[in-house]
Amino acid sequence: MSTPYLLIDAGNSRVKWALVQADGTQTHSGAFSHGGQLVKGTGDPLQSRHEPDWSALPAPGSAWLSNVAGDAVARRIDAFIDRHWPGLARTTVRSAAQQCGVTNAYTTPSQLGSDRWAGMIGARAAFPGEPLLIATFGTATTLEALTADGVFVGGLIAPGWSLMMRSLGEHTAQLPTLDSTAARGLLDGDNAAGQREPAERGAWFATDTPRSLSSGCALAQIGLIERMWRHLQDEWQVSVRLVVGGGAAGELVQALSVPYTRHDSLVLAGLALIAAQAPVYPSTHTRPV
């Protein structure tokens, strides 16, 4: 068996990771929070109760990272890797003008988030030769339009579902601040008192403020996705596959009225392809991609 790659996708709320063989076979994977859930006395967001135990894993030959969470999280991830595999060669992926069959149409290609770039590479490999609209429901909701021949023509960024709800709570005098945990039950059809809403009112019309917030912010997300999907269908005059993923996808896709495909590991899949196609360098702590 070949030496695996360690792949790390550090988003704004969670870190997802996987060990992957050179042929793309995933042998181990997991996710943990990098903020808010601290072990008492550590003061380190990576020292959470959800920190993975890598002690029994086979040693990887290199690590490949997408990090959109900032320098502090990058340093903590480095320290965490070094606790298990000191000096492991690692590469922080950056967006490029062209890579792994995807062409970046951004005016300044390096401005594109590495997670979005790796996700498009993963999506193109998963659905080759298809025009795609990729929607990721995370802290931010992002959309990427990818042509059948792999050209990323552009995208959109909007506040995510949780961020939208939290912003309304923090910037208004009377609206509550909802988190995604509280809002999930409200989307299931219960009002704030835990009672089922009458079906004749319609699934999305609420009779209390918390559920109005949850449903309204969810439909703002869905309206954006469906409008842009229909726009691409009209503009390209072809069937466009809508690919959805992200931490809030489970709650939001129930409101979609258009066909979609769920894929929650596009970034890790893209990182695996980038790692497999990268030139081989002598072992170093960090190296170019």
Swiss-Prot record:
Catalytic activity annotated for this protein? (R)-pantothenate + ATP = (R)-4'-phosphopantothenate + ADP + H(+)
Q: Name one GO cellular component term.
A: cytoplasm
Q: Which cofactor does it need?
A: NH4(+); K(+)
Binding positions for substrate?
Y106, G113, S114, D115, R116, T209
Q: What is this protein called?
A: Type III pantothenate kinase
Q: What class of enzyme is it?
A: transferase
One GO term under biological process is: coenzyme A biosynthetic process
